[in-house]
């Protein structure tokens, strides 16, 4: 999907001239620059290797292996995020005692949920995976399938008395059949 490509490229720092779903010269140029910077074949085609490299920008995080001298503060500065996001994504790690070789989740500085693209079932799943990595306390369950055969998910967070349900049935015009 061109909009998702444009979203990933813009989040990676490559100007696409707006997210409009049109694979024009600005998107092509941004794609080629991304490919060159990431050691990929500079063919202007968003093939499997390019999507693999771009995927972290759709997920909103990546994994980092702890090296000597790493601190959450240094990692936040290096990757343009903040310490609070790293702490939230890694509740099982002691920030004062990082172990060399351990892997930590590094959330990017941008919001996971985009508001400037049309959602698809695949983007919904990607966003959910990104939210789950950033906020590991979220409980995720599949509660069925839509009339179009795509999974329906429920996300649970918190344990208060008030319960609120948000759903993604609006994607692909499925709101028509949502009770």
Predicted features and spans:
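Amphipathic, well-packed alpha-helical segments that form the structural scaffold of globular domains
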Residues: 6-10, 133-136
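M14 metallocarboxypeptidase catalytic domain recognition
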Residues: 58-179
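Short acidic, glycine/serine/threonine-rich helix-capping segments at coil-helix boundaries
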Residues: 1-2, 10-54, 65-69, 87-100
């Amino acid at each position: 999907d061109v909009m998702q490509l444009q979203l990933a490229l813009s989040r990676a720092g490559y100007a696409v001239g707006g997210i409009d779903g049109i694979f024009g010269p600005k998107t092509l140029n941004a794609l080629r620059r991304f490919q060159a910077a990431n050691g990929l074949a500079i063919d202007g085609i968003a093939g499997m290797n390019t999507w693999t490299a771009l995927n972290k920008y759709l997920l909103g995080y990546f994994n980092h292996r702890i090296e000597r001298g790493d601190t959450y503060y240094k990692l936040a500065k290096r990757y343009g995020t903040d310490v609070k996001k790293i702490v939230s994504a890694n509740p099982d790690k002691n920030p004062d005692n990082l172990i060399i070789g351990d892997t930590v989740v590094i959330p990017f500085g941008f919001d996971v949920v985009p508001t400037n693209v049309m959602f698809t079932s695949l983007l919904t799943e990607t966003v959910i995976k990104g939210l789950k990595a950033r906020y590991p306390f979220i409980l995720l369950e599949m509660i069925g399938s839509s009339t179009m055969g795509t999974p329906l998910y429920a996300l649970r967070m918190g344990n208060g008395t008030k319960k609120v349900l948000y759903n993604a049935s609006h994607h692909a015009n499925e709101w028509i059949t949502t009770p």
